[in-house]
UniProtKB/Swiss-Prot annotation:
Entry membrane topology: Multi-pass membrane protein
Pfam families: FtsX, MacB_PCD
Principal place of residence: membrane
Family, similarity comment: Belongs to the ABC-4 integral membrane protein family. LolC/E subfamily.
Function: Part of an ATP-dependent transport system responsible for the release of lipoproteins targeted to the outer membrane from the inner membrane. Such a release is dependent of the sorting-signal (absence of an Asp at position 2 of the mature lipoprotein) and of LolA.
NCBIfam families, A to Z: lolCE (TIGR02212)
Name of the protein: Lipoprotein-releasing system transmembrane protein LolC
Underlying gene: lolC
Amino acid sequence: MYKPISLFIALRYLWNTHLPNFKKIITILSIIGISITTASLIIITSIINGSEKNFEKNILSFIPHLIITNKNQCIKKDQFPENILKLNNIKNISDLISKEIIVQSKNDISMAEVIGIDHTNYYNIHNYNIKSVLKTLKPGYYNIIIGKQLARKLNVFIGDRLKLIFLSNTKNFFSGEIFKQRTFKIINFFSTKKEVDYYQILMNKEDSLNFLNYSKDYVTGWRVWLKNPLSLNVNEIKKITHPLFLLDWTTQKGELFKAMKIEKYIMFLFLFLVLLVSILNIVVILTICTVEKQNAVAILQTQGLLNCKIMLIFIIFGSSTAIIGNILGTLISLTLIIQNDFLKFFINIFIDETNIPIIVIPYQIFFINITITLFTILSTLYPSWKAIQLKPSRILSNE
């Protein structure tokens, strides 16, 4: 006798040469549906992984993930909340001298952000590729390095001078002057090919303190860089830094990230609906099978086969479709990802030619396969349970 008997009978029910064409078509469609769902989930999840990594690398690496400051954005260094260093997600912290300003050239005017730097906080701008010219930002010379796109907008070149203007926190009662301004010399440009090229100006830290009327023991705040900025827990950090103000990267780029998350959830919803259709096909197959195999089930029961083993026949029968579909879908998705020319061609039909970042994470593939298989197994329980509710004496009495 074939053992295990439940597996042998289930596979015979799944596919044999005597199956009607209608059943074969439904079985094939169910396998195709689950294959498409699995392949789509793996491909889309991999693209989302790549997009998030690209977002983190090209955008979040050029802005601080957190800024700790106070209401006036001018705070003593000794007020630094040292408890924040205990958090595991902290990668780097440095003090910050920064101010939003107006920058004026002979030809144009624009808004910008000035940042004071020296060797102690060079890490914050290591992506700017200006280490070789950093030494030229000597204190007292009032030299600056500006983004190429900002220079293009202002129509200025190396050696030209810019007037930097900012709103002072204090107002002179007699003169009424509330703006402070100073002329700086451009000694170089930086180009990151990112958004910061349009608005950032770098200057020596001591010069920035003098320009902004800060004492040496004062800073604008502290820049915090996280190991994983996408898993930021703002509430936890707010408790530690209270009563100081906490500005996180979501205030600047949060809308873009929210849009990405909404798109991800919508895609998963559509794919879940595709999976639901495939699972309903499996339920239909099982229901038809239990009706057709009533006599066979009754005979197996009279022969002493346990109800749990009869249920197992139908569970294996239904879940086999999911397992085959998962294997095919995984192989198809990995083939398309590895040989991504077809995938890029297909995407570029709907979107202008662009580079699609793809990152495959093995545990996600495993999770997708397990989840789909579990959904399928759960969908087989009710038809399998109904199959063993039939009384053999009643069914066989008509034979």
